[in-house]
From Swiss-Prot:
It holds the Pfam family Flu_M1_C. It is found in: Virion membrane; Host nucleus. Plays critical roles in virus replication, from virus entry and uncoating to assembly and budding of the virus particle. M1 binding to ribonucleocapsids (RNPs) in nucleus seems to inhibit viral transcription. Interaction of viral NEP with M1-RNP is thought to promote nuclear export of the complex, which is targeted to the virion assembly site at the apical plasma membrane in polarized epithelial cells. Interactions with NA and HA may bring M1, a non-raft-associated protein, into lipid rafts. Forms a continuous shell on the inner side of the lipid bilayer in virion, where it binds the RNP. The gene is M. GO terms for cellular component: host cell nucleus; membrane; virion membrane. It comes from the Viruses. Homodimer and homomultimer. Interacts with NEP. Binds ribonucleocapsid by both interacting with genomic RNA and NP protein. May interact with HA and NA. Cannot bind NP without genomic RNA. The keyword RNA-binding applies. Its main location: virion. GO terms for biological process: viral budding from plasma membrane. One of its GO terms (molecular function) is structural constituent of virion. This is Matrix protein 1. A motif (Nuclear localization signal) lies at residues 101-105. Residues 165-252 are annotated as: RNP-binding.
Amino acid sequence: MSLLTEVETYVLSIVPSGPLKAEIAQRLEDVFAGKNTDLEALMEWLKTRPILSPLTKGILGFVFTLTVPSERGLQRRRFVQNALNGNGDPNNMDRAVKLYRKLKREITFHGAKEIALSYSAGALASCMGLIYNRMGAVTTESAFGLICATCEQIADSQHKSHRQMVITTNPLIRHENRMVLASTTAKAMEQMAGSSEQAAEAMEVASQARQMVQAMRAIGTHPSSSTGLKNDLLENLQAYQKRMGVQMQRFK
């Protein structure tokens, strides 16, 4: 796996699933391929994205700044600086300075990542802030190692939270989660179907599924009524793809 592929993987792991994630993935691909060279426009686009947490925006802003060539005098962005200040905790800043000194001596991506993984997410964010604000300089490989270590810590905590929801025994939470997943799957089907004539059937299935979820929420239904709803939709989507000549593994 190449360095930039690894960075893209880690960064996308902390972005919530949805149309915005696909947009961000495309922006990262363009940046890493050298196709997007307007850092100012890129940062303005990032600043106005909804849903993303300030820290996620800060990390993405840091990645873009490291990767896109820019004029030396280009202004640093406040939304990135605020996100990478370690919540203003002086302890985070102290640890960040210690980490920075270690990273300065490290020139490899994996070496920097290993060192950074022993620090808290707050200290890691503060260290990124030091580098972003030009208070310190490390190799690009070391900076990417720092970014990936931060993303790994964030993704770990998100995974624990996600697992707690998946294994919850509360039937109401499970019911709502199944309906949310079915609704987002239907939306994705509508987007993938496009405007071809063959797409009408897939669009109809997706539309009916969304109407069903709305009705279930409106009238209140038994928690078991949503079982298998998302899987039924995915089977329909796969059947549609087969007819269109697209062979894909099932993504349950």
